[in-house]
């Protein structure tokens, strides 16, 4: 798949050395020429971004960034001055956080699969070694374009079609303790939009309720949940979202009401297209839990067969231990 880069620029934000370190911004005075190397870099950044855990946001009414972006989209300003303004705002916001270290600031407007995007990222540089033409070893620096966590992307096509959308802005969820998400929300003056985790949990509840109102037996309910999981798994593998209408077509109609109609009538508040969350969807076909030094995970269809739950006595009986577990127990008895 190819990517079409329309405008791209790089700026530098670096930390000064000394007792009171500060962030300095070095602004490029022209856009990068679009070359095969530039498009290859952006394709790698795009692919890396696709694989990362992301959150959704929307601009606040008073967002200065959104105002600047609107001026760009209305052709009241050019991409270069827009990027200068963004770099200065980013540097100012980044200076408030203890993890501030700077990097290469990338802004790129590109098209992928008939969708226009604005990609913004702060990429770290890494040090490595190379062997030159004289077979001498020298130190070199390179952009770490696969391992980055300060980035956001705006779906310009979605924003243009539906300004009230709650999913046109995405940003990478930060690692624990680094508050990257908070930083980018402040930089963009944005707030939480679509919550994929909540949407997935609501979807699972709707599936359970749908089976209950259809008065399905336990095996029938497990079969429906398995169908839901297989559909969602296929969407994850293909990089697609869960389409409620497609999912509904894959499920049986119960009491003359299909699944999509059921969710609308019961007002679950589900989006027509839902970003799948793998860990949440696993509960469709698996039971798992941990506590007090014990971790248990098993396929749902084994409950009542190889695993017997006694709710009254709070016990779970396993019939037929896994061979490796049995061997460990035998060796250490």
From Swiss-Prot:
Keyword Disulfide bond found: no
One Pfam family this sequence matches: NA37
UniProt KW keywords: Cytoplasm
GO cellular component: bacterial nucleoid; cytoplasm
Gene Ontology MF terms in the entry: double-stranded DNA binding; single-stranded RNA binding
Entry's localization field: Cytoplasm, Nucleoid
Family stated for the protein in its record: Belongs to the YejK family.
Name of the protein in question: Nucleoid-associated protein APL_0429
């Amino acid at each position: 798949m190819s990517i079409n880069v329309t405008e791209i620029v790089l700026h530098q934000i670096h930390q000064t050395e000394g007792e009171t370190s500060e962030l300095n911004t070095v602004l490029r005075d022209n856009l990068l020429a679009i070359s095969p190397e530039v498009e290859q870099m952006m394709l790698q950044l795009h692919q890396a971004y696709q694989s990362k855990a992301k959150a959704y946001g929307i601009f606040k009414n008073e967002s200065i960034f959104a105002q600047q972006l609107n001026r760009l989209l209305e052709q009241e300003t050019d991409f270069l001055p827009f990027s200068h303004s963004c770099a200065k705002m980013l540097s100012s916001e980044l200076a408030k956080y203890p993890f501030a270290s700077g990097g290469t600031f990338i802004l790129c407007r590109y098209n992928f699969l008939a969708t226009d995007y604005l990609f913004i990222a702060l990429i770290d540089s890494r040090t490595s070694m190379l062997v030159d033409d004289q077979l001498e070893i020298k130190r070199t620096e390179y952009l770490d374009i696969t391992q980055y966590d300060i980035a956001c992307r705006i779906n310009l096509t979605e924003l243009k079609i539906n300004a009230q959308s709650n999913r046109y802005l995405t940003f990478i969820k930060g690692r624990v303790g680094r508050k990257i998400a908070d930083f980018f929300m402040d930089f963009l003056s944005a707030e939480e939009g679509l919550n994929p985790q909540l949407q997935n949990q609501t979807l699972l509840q709707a599936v359970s309720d749908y089976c209950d109102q259809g008065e399905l037996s336990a095996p029938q309910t497990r079969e429906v949940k398995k169908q839901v999981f297989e559909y969602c798994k296929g969407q994850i593998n293909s990089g697609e979202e869960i389409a409620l209408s497609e999912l509904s077509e894959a499920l049986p109609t119960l009491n003359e009401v299909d699944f999509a109609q059921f969710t609308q009538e019961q007002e679950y508040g589900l989006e027509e297209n839902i970003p799948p969350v793998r860990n949440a969807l696993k509960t469709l076909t698996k039971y798992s839990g941990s506590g007090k030094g014990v971790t248990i995970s098993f396929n749902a269809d084994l409950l009542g067969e190889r695993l017997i739950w006694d709710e009254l006595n709070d016990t779970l009986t396993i019939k037929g231990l896994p061979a490796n577990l049995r061997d460990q127990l035998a060796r250490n008895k």
